[in-house]
Amino acid sequence: MSKAVGIDLGTTYSCVAHFANDRVDIIANDQGNRTTPSFVAFTDTERLIGDAAKNQAAMNPSNTVFDAKRLIGRNFNDPEVQADMKHFPFKLIDVDGKPQIQVEFKGETKNFTPEQISSMVLGKMKETAESYLGAKVNDAVVTVPAYFNDSQRQATKDAGTIAGLNVLRIINEPTAAAIAYGLDKKGKEEHVLIFDLGGGTFDVSLLSIEDGIFEVKATAGDTHLGGEDFDNRLVNHFIQEFKRKNKKDLSTNQRALRRLRTACERAKRTLSSSAQTSVEIDSLFEGIDFYTSITRARFEELCADLFRSTLDPVEKVLRDAKLDKSQVDEIVLVGGSTRIPKVQKLVTDYFNGKEPNRSINPDEAVAYGAAVQAAILTGDESSKTQDLLLLDVAPLSLGIETAGGVMTKLIPRNSTIPTKKSEIFSTYADNQPGVLIQVFEGERAKTKDNNLLGKFELSGIPPAPRGVPQIEVTFDVDSNGILNVSAVEKGTGKSNKITITNDKGRLSKEDIEKMVAEAEKFKEEDEKESQRIASKNQLESIAYSLKNTISEAGDKLEQADKDTVTKKAEETISWLDSNTTASKEEFDDKLKELQDIANPIMSKLYQAGGAPGGAAGGAPGGFPGGAPPAPEAEGPTVEEVD
């Protein structure tokens, strides 16, 4: 059985799943949650990922990083990055035109790229899967929003590499959700619209599903719209209300903001099932308690424009697929934000009262589909996956700049991938020795309005009048939606090519290798820390249980012996209180000291008729019935039993 998993790397939450024996398991994390917050926190002593990181966000706002997906593959001066910076409690800095996150970690200032933060979340998902499956997990299918551009896809793939994963494929979230919906559907062709509104991104895809063939007809979306934006509206609303009531601006205090944001997120969820909810935060800012309430209608009004804007991509997809809305057979809602009643109502009204299909779990569908795809790519023989074929599309048109800054498209948007397209171009001036080939993606007529993916030079063209040399440019989009471009001059056979990986902002091979090594180092440190804590806890529990056993020993021991052990145990406990950051070795030494004193006395107690019932096995060297202690260097240690 292959141990390949599907990972839904979300803006706010991530989810991991595994396909085996004809079924998909969504894997719960160590807290028992089936989704894990995409949060990473750095403290003086350790690095926290997931629930642990999110839970301490209010105490440590400037070193708790979230929303890396809104930064990944983007430039620092991207207007959306600039707008987000205003909401982020952590510090973003500009490194070679790319955003990096600056935090304090173990007493020093560290910079991390969004890829590194995402790789830590992916690493956490990998560990979650490994502890459930009981085996190493190397291969994964990772999902991205369908509307992610080339650089965002490439950066996500890099994050997987840094996490020590072999990324089998990057697939689009709505397509993965469609697999979850259609895996058991057999029979006539149906048109399915996937409406995926998550924590930070929004996608709409239209597919035709027939007998295991999933063909994406068109896709559209907004890589910067989701639940976070609704939270922001609530946060701003309450900041204003707090100002009105108390004449104070709490937005200057990051801790207050984080507590308010957490309360807003909770309120938003409650409003999906209740018509109104109260928000109560004690001592929010400068000792002022903030008690207020909000109705569903008010929330809908605050987010009205955002909710309405979700219908634009729906219209675009129908136009691109040349379908009328009456021809859509099923509407499938994916992503936590589709639980908002107003969003559901807008969709239903748009499709003239047609109710959306609720057969799949909106939080888990994407990871589910990714797990199925991972099983297929690693050769799973299940009957369910045998005939499954995925035909996805490139979300944005791809082309090169020709004379006058014109965008000449080679691959139009919504072309099925993988795809390959060649065109012949020529020189613009007589005796031109070389051409600069600039690759863009986007829908506008002029390249300056589109996104530059990369450029390369094809030189050594022999002198000739303009228009004579023949330069063949080939675009090749692979199944991850990542582009390779090559150019060859027909006369001389001179060629040059690049994988478009956004030269401007792409991590180089060396960068990635360095980050992989760093990730290993962090992992080792995390493990060291957890071993240190285990030693500390062991010492503490043994000291306390010794104290208790002695106090219940009655006249089975001489008073002098009892005093000796009690004194040593109390000494150990007070040492622990003042040395919480000691090393593992120090804790182990203290344990040995304690056991050297206690073990001989405790064995007297056991020979005198055993420890009192309640303390059986609680003391170190707890050998019931006076069995001799095992010959161990440190004296036997017994796990506590209830």
From Swiss-Prot:
Residues 606-642 are annotated as: Disordered. GO terms for molecular function: ATP binding; ATP hydrolysis activity; ATP-dependent protein folding chaperone; heat shock protein binding; protein folding chaperone; tRNA binding; unfolded protein binding. Binds human HTN3/histatin-5, a peptide from saliva, and mediates its fungicidal activity. Interacts with polyadenylate-binding protein PAB1 and Hsp70 chaperone SSA1 on translating ribosomes. Interacts with NAP1. The modification Phosphoserine is found at S62, S551, S603. GO terms for cellular component: cytoplasm; cytosol; extracellular region; fungal-type cell wall; fungal-type vacuole membrane; nucleus; plasma membrane; transcription repressor complex. It is found in: Cytoplasm; Secreted, Cell wall. May play a role in the transport of polypeptides both across the mitochondrial membranes and into the endoplasmic reticulum. A functional difference between SSA1 and SSA2 proteins is expected. SSA1 can participate in the ATP-dependent disassembly of clathrin-coated vesicles. Keywords: Acetylation, ATP-binding, Cell wall, Cytoplasm, Isopeptide bond, Nucleotide-binding, Phosphoprotein, Secreted, Stress response, Ubl conjugation. SUPFAM superfamilies: Actin-like ATPase domain, Heat shock protein 70kD (HSP70), C-terminal subdomain, Heat shock protein 70kD (HSP70), peptide-binding domain. This is Heat shock protein SSA1. The lineage of its organism: Eukaryota, Fungi, Dikarya, Ascomycota, Saccharomycotina. The modification N-acetylserine is found at S2. There is a cross-link at K556 (Glycyl lysine isopeptide (Lys-Gly) (interchain with G-Cter in ubiquitin)). PANTHER family: HEAT SHOCK PROTEIN 70KDA. It comes from Saccharomyces cerevisiae (strain ATCC 204508 / S288c) (Baker's yeast). Belongs to the heat shock protein 70 family. The keyword Ubl conjugation applies. Gene3D superfamilies: 1.20.1270.10, 3.30.30.30, 3.30.420.40, Actin, Chain A, domain 4 (3.90.640.10), Substrate Binding Domain Of DNAk, Chain A, domain 1 (2.60.34.10). Present with 269000 molecules/cell in log phase SD medium.
